[in-house]
Curated annotation (Swiss-Prot):
Upper lineage: Eukaryota, Metazoa, Ecdysozoa, Nematoda, Chromadorea
Region described as Disordered: 218-239, 676-702
Keyword annotations: ATP-binding, Cell cycle, Chaperone, Cytoplasm, Nucleotide-binding, Stress response
Superkingdom to which the source organism belongs: Eukaryota
UniProt keyword annotation of Ion transport present: no
Protein name (record): Heat shock protein 90
Quaternary organization: Homodimer. Interacts (via TPR repeat-binding and central region) with pph-5 (via phosphatase domain); the interaction promotes pph-5 phosphatase activity. Interacts (via central region) with co-chaperone cdc-37 (via N-terminus); the interaction inhibits daf-21 ATPase activity.
Length: 702
């Protein structure tokens, strides 16, 4: 058969990964067994699911099990399953030539100091065999192909050949040639310990071939010889007494026997009161391939018109690919009457709860249900509704412990905000879980706590969105609100923009952005009167500014939100904020037509108490066609854009204006600068008309 052997090179990333696994010291090498058993369990799941619609698939072997055989003499450990098996193409692709999406991510995580036990989460668990083996031989038989053998000593290549193994009628057999310094993994005690620790809740029998001793009676040849001597001496024998009884002796004989290591019944079928935290932790790890314990668990059953049991877990941390749409998540396993149906039942959980791990075991769904049928199933819709309700309870329980909830929120806060955007039914409940930094202190606060601290005359919840806490805390928009003693929520996560589009109010209080038009702060009669007077006093300046800026702004008006800044740019109540515009511009597949009408409505608000605005108003009153006014207005507008969180369409012309101001401040005339030092494109557009004669007047504005 060797003439039919084909040699393949490992894909570059896989070769690198194997080199890393082989040449780096890892203390917890035992996880290789967990990974291989987990893969075997997946293969058994697949054949069992296939057999629901095609029972003949099990003609090649009815019994579904995993068998572990240690051989101390040959220093090999064999793991065999009667699962779906692999075709030749599967062996070539899955075990070497096609890198999984997680290969590179796992290597980066390893190099960053992650634990080797994370390997299963990245879909490359098979290669952990090389933690303990220097050569691995895989024989596999799929019902749709002949039997083939894969072999590698991890030297950058592997061999695939046709190979018939009478023991493998369907499924996969992995023979690991154990390294000299790892032979303790062949010890029965060690294997039992690892299986109990990592794999006791696998849904198929895990059999270990154990060596045992038994006493066996054999004929005692020495006693027979002595008896013959007696007969020769002519002694009379009492026939009735001991009717030719044979003399025997007991000897010890070695034999092999299959011992089942995981006889525990499915944990979700047991009474929650009888299950320890350690058992939940072990089940969670075997279910999720996580190396850490879970953060929280919910174990319940629903009875009545509909019956199902469920066991749900919240992990300690979010997986690296939590929001990767293309990747199917390993979240909820669906069982029907203890029979595994599918690995990841997306229909059971909304997208925003995709971090929840667990199992659901239904009594009512048909065994042969397909994904298409699931989408139409009314039973499933009821189960889903119950699961989401229980998830809310579970998060509520986590929230009772402040430290635990802080951990949870750091990892899954984005999911809750996505839920507010997507799930109108549970929006109110989800909003209770939100936490934000505020102008009142460093500790994140809930909306409920914010409302409890609101001033008597405050009717709205104020918030600002932005890139970071430091940026929003220093923003011009929060000046007046903070100075009046009102608390402002700081929303610094891009998803907050989508969240507040749906979360219009909380506890009857409207959420209001301090960066948008229509901000109403509680005012005294005196303040209202002053504001009206300011509007009249600055009416002419507002008109001149609007004429200069033309279509760049929709409206120019007097502000009630500024204290130390001369002006700011606000957006219409229903348009995008500056932060949202920034986020949308960063979208590779953005809709440019949406950008047009959502991002265009900018309003310039001026501070009537600021010296710059007062001087500018006086300048306009004297001569509204003053040559410097136009450039000052444009410069103020562009600076306000930047300060308000927007980006400039023409940053170069803004830079040129700034340089011109610096020249004026330093009393540098144009004749002192060589023409070659200033690009013609800049001077043409950016030159301030009448700059020379107005140099002294610019100082007044300062």
């Amino acid at each position: 058969m060797s003439e039919n052997a084909e040699t393949f090179a490992f894909q570059a990333e896989i070769a690198q990964l194997m080199s890393l696994i082989i040449n780096t010291f890892y203390s917890n090498k035992e996880i290789y067994l967990r990974e291989l058993i987990s893969n075997a369990s997946d293969a058994l799941d697949k054949i069992r699911y296939q057999a629901l619609t095609e029972p003949s698939e099990l003609d090649t072997g009815k019994e579904l099990f995993i068998k572990i055989t240690p051989n101390k003499e040959e220093k090999t450990l064999t793991i065999m399953d009667t699962g779906i098996g692999m075709t030749k193409a599967d062996l070539v692709n899955n075990l070497g030539t096609i890198a999984k999406s997680g290969t590179k991510a796992f290597m980066e995580a390893l190099q960053a100091g992650a634990d080797i036990s994370m390997i299963g989460q990245f879909g490359v668990g098979f290669y952990s065999a090389f933690l303990v083996a220097d050569k691995v031989v895989v024989t596999s038989k799929n019902n749709d192909d002949d039997s083939y053998q894969w072999e590698s000593s991890a030297g950058g290549s592997f061999v695939v050949r046709p190979f018939n193994d009478p023991e493998v009628t369907r499924g996969t057999k992995i023979v690991m040639h154990i390294k000299e310094d790892q032979i303790d993994f062949l010890e029965e005690r060690k294997i039992k310990e690892i299986v109990k620790k990592h794999s006791q809740f696998i849904g198929y029998p895990i059999k270990l071939v154990v060596e045992k001793e038994r006493e066996k009676e054999v004929e005692d040849e020495e006693a027979v010889e002595a008896k013959d001597e007696e007969k020769k001496e002519g002694e009379v024998e009492n026939v009735a007494d001991d009717a030719d009884k044979k003399k025997t002796k007991k000897i010890k004989e070695k034999y092999f026997e299959d011992e089942e290591l995981n006889k525990t019944k499915p944990i979700w079928t047991r009474n929650p009161d009888d299950i320890s935290n350690e058992e939940y932790a072990e089940f969670y790890k075997s279910l999720s391939n996580d190396w850490e314990d879970h953060l929280a668990v919910k174990h319940f059953s629903v009875e009545g018109q509909l019956e199902f049991r469920a066991l749900l877990f919240v992990p300690q941390r979010a997986p690296f690919d939590l929001f990767e749409n293309k990747k199917s998540k390993n979240s909820i396993k669906l069982y029907v009457r203890r029979v595994f149906i599918m690995e990841n039942c997306e229909e059971l959980m909304p997208e925003y709860l995709n971090f929840i791990k667990g199992v659901v075991d239904s009594e009512d769904l048909p065994l042969n249900i397909s994904r298409e049928m699931l989408q139409q199933s009314k039973i499933l819709k009821v189960i889903r509704k119950n699961l989401v309700k229980k998830c809310m309870e579970l998060i509520d329980e986590v929230a009772e412990d402040k430290d635990n909830f802080k951990k949870f929120y750091e990892q899954f806060g984005k999911n809750l905000k996505l839920g507010i955007h997507e799930d109108s039914t549970n929006r109110k409940k989800l909003s209770d879980f939100l936490r934000y930094s505020t102008s009142a202190g460093d500790e994140p606060t809930s909306l409920k706590e914010y409302v409890s601290r609101m001033k008597e005359n405050q009717t709205q919840i104020y918030y600002i969105t932005g890139e970071s806490k430091d940026v929003v805390a220093a923003s011009a928009f929060v000046e007046r609100v903070k100075s009046r003693g009102f608390e402002v929520l700081y929303m610094c996560d891009p998803i907050d923009e989508y969240c507040v589009q749906q979360l219009k109010e909380y506890d009857g209080k409207k959420l209001v952005s301090v960066t948008k038009e229509g901000l109403e702060l509680p005012e005294t009669e005196e303040e209202k009167k002053k504001f009206e007077e300011d509007k009249v006093a600055y009416e002419n300046l507002c008109k001149v500014i609007k004429d200069i800026l033309e279509k760049k702004v929709e409206k120019v008006g007097v502000s009630n939100r500024l204290v130390s800044s001369p002006c700011c740019i606000v957006t219409s109540e229903y348009g995008w904020s500056a932060n949202m515009e920034r986020i949308m511009k960063a979208q590779a597949l953005r809709d440019s037509s949406t950008m047009g009408y959502m991002a265009a409505k900018k309003h310039l608000e001026i501070n009537p108490d600021h010296a710059i605005m007062k001087t500018l108003r006086d300048r306009v009153e004297v001569d509204k066609n003053d040559k410097t006014v136009k450039d000052l207005v444009v410069l103020l507008f562009e600076t306000a854009l930047l300060a308000s969180g927007f980006s400039l369409e023409e940053p170069q012309s803004h830079a040129s204006r700034i340089y011109r101001m610096i020249k004026l401040g330093l009393d540098i005339g144009d004749d002192e600068i060589e023409d070659s030092a200033v690009p013609s494109s800049c001077t043409a557009e950016a030159k301030i008309e009448g700059a020379e004669e107005d140099a002294s007047r610019m100082e007044e504005v300062d």
